[in-house]
Curated annotation (Swiss-Prot):
Keywords: Cell cycle, Cell division, Centromere, Chromosome, Cytoplasm, Cytoskeleton, Developmental protein, Kinetochore, Meiosis, Mitosis. This is Protein zwilch homolog. Belongs to the ZWILCH family. Disruption phenotype: RNAi-mediated knockdown results in embryonic lethality. RNAi-mediated knockdown results in defective chromosome segregation, premature spindle pole separation and incorrectly attached kinetochores. In addition, knl-1 localization to the spindle-associated rod-shaped structures but not to kinetochores is lost during anaphase of meiosis I. RNAi-mediated knockdown also results in abolished targeting of the spindly-like protein spdl-1 to the kinetochore. It comes from Caenorhabditis elegans. It is found in: Cytoplasm, Cell cortex; Chromosome, Centromere, Kinetochore; Cytoplasm, Cytoskeleton, Spindle. The lineage of its organism: Eukaryota, Metazoa, Ecdysozoa, Nematoda, Chromadorea.
Amino acid sequence: MPLTIEQLKQYNEKMAAKGEEDDAPAPVLLLDKYRVRVLPLTSIPFVMNHSSVSQLSLSSEDVLVVDFPSKGTGSGAGKAEKKMIFKKKIEPMEDSFEDKENVNEGGPLMTSFLTLEKLRKGMVGDVEIIGYECETSFFDANPIPLSDGVSLQRYIRLNCSEHFSPSISTLPVWISTTSSKFPSICWLAAGRTNRNVQFAAATRVLGHFNNENSERVVKQLNQACGTSQLNKYRAVYEEIRKIATENRPAPGEVTIDVRWSTKSTLVLLEHPDNAADCTIKIDLGWGDKRFFVDDEIFEQLFFVLNLADVLANPDNEVIFPMAPPANFDDLVQEMDALVEASSREDNVFVSNENFRGGDITDKVWNIVRKCNDVKQVTLLFRNFLQALAYGKIKSHAQERNKSHLASLIRISKSSEFKIPVLERLSTIDMMMEIGVESLRRRVIDIFSSQLLYPSDELEFILQTCENDLPAGNGAMNSAAISLLPITMALATANRIYELLNEKDHVILPDLTRRILQKYTASMIEKSRRGETETEYTFETTLPLLRMYKEGFMSKRPCIWTCENSNTVGANVQARVLTSLELQPSLEHINRLVNDSRPVWTATEEKPAMIKDLNADYTVVHTIFSYLPKM
């Protein structure tokens, strides 16, 4: 029975829902031997590095990927290899004379541990440590031996209609293959373009970067495309890597995608020229504090959101961020000292614009947020409110301060004041309000002082966002939620600020305005649908001349590509993609290349050379051939 698109989509859904400890779902099989999946072309390793996948002009954005159902299927070589390696590892231990670890007879065991300090000390010069504290995520592929892959490709071409339904028979087919020698072909592809032109493609791994591979690539390009071809270069720099940790399960990332073209002779790992365009892609993730210049802003934002969540869902618990927890007696003394200081000052004549010392409610917030539980907050609030009732507080709250505590401070100076009843939710509400006011003023101040953004305009955006949020959230709830897109916009704009030349900071207000509009509009739209906005991404393209390239280009590009094409008239006969990657996403390719990669040690007497660093790259070559209609 022919395979259908519904079967393939159901398999993808089951794989996406599978937990780490769950068994893998039964694959969709071809000839009871090969796994078949439907995947977007943009997810295929090496091909995904193409600057514009649409230029390949394939019949579909999705492709069929064929491989084995599991690793080692169809061959016992994998198991035998593991056994052999294990045996080699234990052989030295069989001879006691070979164990030189305990060099002092009768003495303690002599050991040496590799630390980050030692690693950095050994890396002399400008050498980065790639992949430290990082788990690599590999593409799910169980490759087929190359000879079988070639036969399977021919079989599918001749018998496609017997095994695939019409809905998938027109999709291009990518077969995952492997071979033990270089050049190792890892992908075989075939299909038709959107103009019904037949194409064939192969991705070959040449090995690690060296002069031999470099010369081979240049020679093949000249043969395929001629010596006067236009070279389209691309270099991707990772400014912040997407590394998940226990405390950062949803990390963000920042990449700078640099693209330029030349008609000069191809040079691998060519540096971008000044006419290059840089696409900055920022993904803040969720709860990733690396994007926040001020850690306190990060902590206070998510603490305020937690308070708002507890008010909306009273059964939830307040999670206080302080670690280690503060001593409550010390907090009582801080509150007493604040009351004493407030009894000696009168800020009634201080304007909102010139107020920089911190509102009285800011100072209360900075004390109560260090508590360990709501009961402690209630006791501290009562101490402060009793001082208000006795007329000890002479300080005034700012006019724009809309919190309930600020209203109580104003009332205490003009009429008879009664201490309100503080229960659990009323305490949390009062705490959230002063937290919102404190964070709002801090964020506005950074926007205006560092990013040159008008404070009045930001106040208007905040108020508009608060008003446009669904009324069901409650007034102060909306005020808390409206801080999220504004603070995320601050983190995004700050990252762009660090990537620009100092003289080009004048474009920041316009970029910041675009970020604010995007984040607030997305927040409001999702809130109206009852969803929570947790995706904050921004992308912009700037000329390299505006970028502080000495900063991000001090790191090596994680991906470097060159694209060429050979045309006859208006028809493209071949496309060639040369790709150099520091960390290919195919596990078997990593193992194959690493086995042949040279090992070097940098010392002060012999620092790392450029050729040593370049050997970290894996060189891959993909050629698309388009067969003209006869």
